[in-house]
């Protein structure tokens, strides 16, 4: 959810930099103390945001040459963000335009593909993750506001409609875009107590009756419990990779592996060291963002 909002902040810097040039003396603000020119704005914008903007523009060109992102992938990601962000997404689209958000999502997807190509998942990583699943289950849910809607969903499930499809159609939870999947969780401390008790009573594959909590009415499906390591290894490898893809520092490190193979030469003397320091600065800023 944060990524598209961060992209919008980057948008402000890129649009401002592209709107003026260092040699432009056109006055854009007048005061009793003196005027401010486009050139002064450009110089100051370059000092504060030039390196990060240049990094994104160059990375996108390099990654776009090596990896391909389809229009369908972009549209699906935008739909996911729209579901997650709601009114915030509408505000971003109104402020920056759909085309710009598409471009930012394309950059994000290119980055993910580079990360998948360069991030390694070891057997030790998988074993550690498997050990951490002890006592946990995996479940999905459909959250609705009232009992009547819950009963309507329940009827459709009994008629054979897919749980995942109904979650996407009816659920008001952010997990809707993932078919209601909540991932793995323990019996205590992670979920609403009433919800957790109902989920842990289910057999794998079983669907609950509507369960009322402070959030509304849930229909819960237990999808998995921890099995033997060898039986789960392939599936868990994908889950561990997904976790690593959500680690911005790991993603930036993976992207830098691609960038190091590109023949990058920065002509601007003020920005010539951008790609000597961008790896460190990006990782640091990403880690800071995650900790907030």
UniProtKB/Swiss-Prot annotation:
UniProt source species: Bacillus subtilis (strain 168)
Record GO cellular component, one term: plasma membrane
Keyword terms: Cell membrane, Isomerase, Lipoprotein, Membrane, Palmitate, Rotamase, Signal
Domain remark in the UniProt entry: All three domains (PPIase domain and the flanking N- and C-terminal domains) are essential for activity.
Family, per entry: Belongs to the PrsA family.
Protein name: Foldase protein PrsA
GO molecular function, one term: peptidyl-prolyl cis-trans isomerase activity
Lipidated sites in chain (S-diacylglycerol cysteine): 20
PANTHER family in the record: FOLDASE PROTEIN PRSA (PTHR47245:SF1), PEPTIDYLPROLYL ISOMERASE (PTHR47245)
Main location: membrane
Cross-referenced Gene3D superfamilies: 3.10.50.40, Trigger factor, C-terminal domain
Lipidation positions, renumbered (N-palmitoyl cysteine): 20
Signal peptide positions (record): 1-19
Keyword flag Membrane: yes
Domain PpiC: 134-224
InterPro entries in the cross-refs: Foldase_PrsA, PPIase_dom_sf, PPIase_PpiC, PPIase_PpiC_CS, PrsA_foldase, Trigger_fac_C_sf, Trigger_fact/SurA_dom_sf
Role of this protein: Essential protein that plays a major role in protein secretion by helping the post-translocational extracellular folding of several secreted proteins. Has PPIase activity but it is not essential for its function in vivo.
Span list, region Disordered: 270-292
């Amino acid at each position: 959810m944060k990524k598209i909002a961060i992209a919008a902040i980057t948008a402000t810097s890129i649009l401002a930099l592209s709107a003026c040039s260092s040699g432009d003396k056109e006055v854009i603000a007048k005061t009793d103390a003196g005027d401010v020119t486009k050139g002064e704005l450009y110089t100051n914008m370059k000092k504060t945001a030039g390196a990060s903007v240049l990094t994104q523009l160059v990375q996108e060109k390099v990654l776009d040459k090596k990896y391909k992102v389809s229009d369908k992938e972009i549209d699906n990601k935008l739909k996911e963000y729209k579901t997650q962000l709601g009114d915030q997404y509408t505000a971003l689209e109104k402020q920056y335009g759909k085309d710009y958000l598409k471009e930012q999502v394309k950059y994000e997807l290119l980055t993910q593909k580079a990360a998948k190509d360069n991030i390694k998942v070891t057997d030790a990583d998988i074993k550690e993750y498997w050990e951490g699943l002890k006592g946990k289950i995996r479940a999905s849910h459909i959250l609705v506001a009232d009992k009547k809607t819950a009963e309507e969903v329940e009827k459709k499930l009994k008629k054979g409609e897919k749980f995942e499809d109904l979650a996407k159609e009816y659920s008001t939870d952010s997990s809707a875009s993932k078919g209601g999947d909540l991932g793995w969780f323990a019996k205590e401390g992670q979920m609403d107590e009433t919800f957790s008790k109902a989920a842990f009573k289910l057999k794998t594959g079983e669907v609950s009756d509507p369960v009322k909590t402070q959030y509304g009415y849930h229909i819960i499906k237990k999808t998995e419990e921890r099995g033997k390591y060898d039986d789960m290894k392939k599936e868990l490898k994908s889950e561990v990779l997904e976790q690593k893809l959500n680690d911005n520092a790991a993603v930036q490190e993976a992207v830098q592996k691609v960038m190091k193979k590109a023949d990058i030469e920065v002509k601007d003397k003020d920005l010539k060291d951008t790609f000597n320091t961008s790896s460190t600065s990006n990782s640091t800023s990403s880690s800071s963002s995650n900790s907030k």
